Structure formats: C-alpha cells, structure tokens
Regions:
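Compositionally biased, low-complexity intrinsically disordered regions
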Residues: 15-16
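Segments surrounding the PLD/"HKD" phosphodiesterase catalytic module and close analogs
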Residues: 12
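Glycine-rich flexible loops
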Residues: 9, 21-277
Length: 277
C-alpha cells in the first residue's frame, strides 16, 4: 500500500469527519490525538495550500499545486482533478516523476500534471510547484513588458521572470501542457528562476516548500497588479538587484513565512484551534 494511502487509511479509522480538520501552526497532533508524522504534516499543508490559493484568488476552478514526496524524492503528490477550493486529504494522489499514478483507484487526474513532473525532474532544489492563470499576470505573458519586482513583499520572485511560448516548439496547440515533452520545454525556459510566464495561459511558480511556493505565487500576482497600476503614473522605480536579494531572504525567513501562512490559513477558514497540542 502506498505511503499516502496508509496515512489516509489511518485517518479514516480515527473517525474524523469527511471534511478535513486542519491543524494549527504547530501541526503536531493527528486525528484521534496521536502525534503527526512528517508526511502527515506535509499532506495537511498541501490541502491548506489549495484552499489558500483559492481564497486569495490566485486560482479559481482551475489551477493546481504539487509537493515533492518528502520521503520519496522520485515521486510527487497532488490532488486528483478538482477545483482547489474543494480539495481534501482523500483527493491527494501520488505520482512518479513521469507523471504515472501510483494508486489511481479510478480517480481522474489533472491533465497538466506534466508541468509538475518535468520541473521536479529538472530542479532538484524544487519541492513544490504552483500553476495558475491569475488574470493580473497574463498581460506580461503576451507583451514585451517584463515583469519586475516593485514591492518588497514579492521577495523571492527573482530578478528575471522568463516567458515560455508553447508555439515556439510545438506549433498550434490548445495551449495546455499535456505531455512531458512540453513540460520539459517549459522547465527549460524556467531555468533556475522562481517563476515562468506561459504566453496567453498563466504562470508556473516553484518553491523550496509548499509554503514557499504559495507565498511567491500570491505575491507575484500582487506585484503584477501593482506594476500595471504604477505604469499609469509614469516611469517606475523597480527594486535593485541588491534589494531583490535581500527581500527574498527576508520574505523566505521562517518568521515571515510562518506568519503569513498562519494568516492566510485562517482567512481560508480551515484551521482549528481545537487541535493545538
């Protein structure tokens, strides 16, 4: 039985409700009062991440987030094909890096999981990938205007956000990344950056953790909106390379990361103080 299925089996035996009861910031207690394992805590974060991305309007009915398996780096975890706001623990599936399901059990899979598998193959430093279609970002994927950091809280987006055009390598398509060949082309365009725009489609964002990827995805969208608004007033003063580096370090610190995660998780409505140890 796959590791994730063994955990979900234990979760069900604990008698928890069908709805996920997400844990507090400490995330040390599992359903039924037992101590959580590292895998359990990561799975909880993945569910919370889906809810946060939906609540913060980074995703709507479409979009997805993945997690490299914390105990099997040659695999990754993500929901079955479902709108992020509705994702629960029972929806989480396990895949190898070629995007084959380990334990499908008849569940429908995201058609663009190749985005995640290809990036995990190319980037050993990446442990989470967010793909979204935030409207604020799209204009920067279809014009020659580069997206650049204008606000300190967007630390981590990097000095360069490349644009990938699927038509360059694959001609006319439906714009979706449907196979690993297309996914690897996208991963090549991403390079060692934190995000890659996808012409007329959206963006893929990477992070060292689920929390890291969510934070960058949210503030990349915010930065795009502010950059667009700022250009209406004239020339824009962007952050310097030094400021970009220092704000990335600040935003990615445990203090800042935990603080914003707790805030977003509570806003999404799926954190319960009753589960605190």
């Amino acid at each position: 039985m796959p590791l994730i299925r063994r955990y979900l089996h234990r979760y069900a035996k604990a008698g928890s409700a069908a709805e996920v009861v997400l844990l507090s910031k400490t995330r040390t207690e599992a359903p039924g009062g037992s101590q959580m394992t590292g895998l359990q805590a990561h799975l909880e974060d993945l569910v919370i991440a889906n809810r946060i991305l939906a609540h913060e309007n980074v995703v709507d009915g479409f979009g997805h987030i993945s997690l490299r398996h914390p105990e099997r780096p040659d695999r990754f975890l993500m929901s079955r094909s479902r709108s992020p706001e509705l994702v629960t623990l029972d929806d989480i599936m396990e895949f190898d890096l070629d995007c084959n399901p380990i334990d499908q059990r008849g569940r429908v899979m995201y058609g663009e999981r190749a985005i995640h598998g290809a990036i995990f193959q190319a980037r050993a430093d990446v442990n989470s990938v967010v793909h979204n279609h935030a409207h604020e970002i799209i204009p920067y994927s279809v014009t020659k205007t580069p997206m650049r950091q204008v606000i300190h809280t967007a630390g981590g987006m990097g000095a360069h956000v490349p644009v990938w055009d699927i038509r360059d390598d694959f001609g006319d398509t439906d714009m979706l990344v449907r196979n690993l060949q297309q996914g690897r082309s996208l991963a090549k365009a991403l390079g060692d950056n934190a995000a890659v725009l996808m012409r007329g489609h959206g963006v893929s964002v990477v992070g060292r953790s689920v929390r890291d990827a969510v934070r960058i995805a949210v503030y990349l969208m915010v930065n795009a909106r502010l950059q667009t608004e700022a250009t209406r007033f004239g020339d824009v003063t962007f952050l310097s390379e030094g400021e970009i580096a220092k704000t990335a370090e600040m935003s990615g610190s445990p203090l800042a990361s935990d603080r914003i995660w707790e805030y977003w998780a509570r806003r999404s409505g799926y954190v319960s103080d009753k589960t605190k140890a």
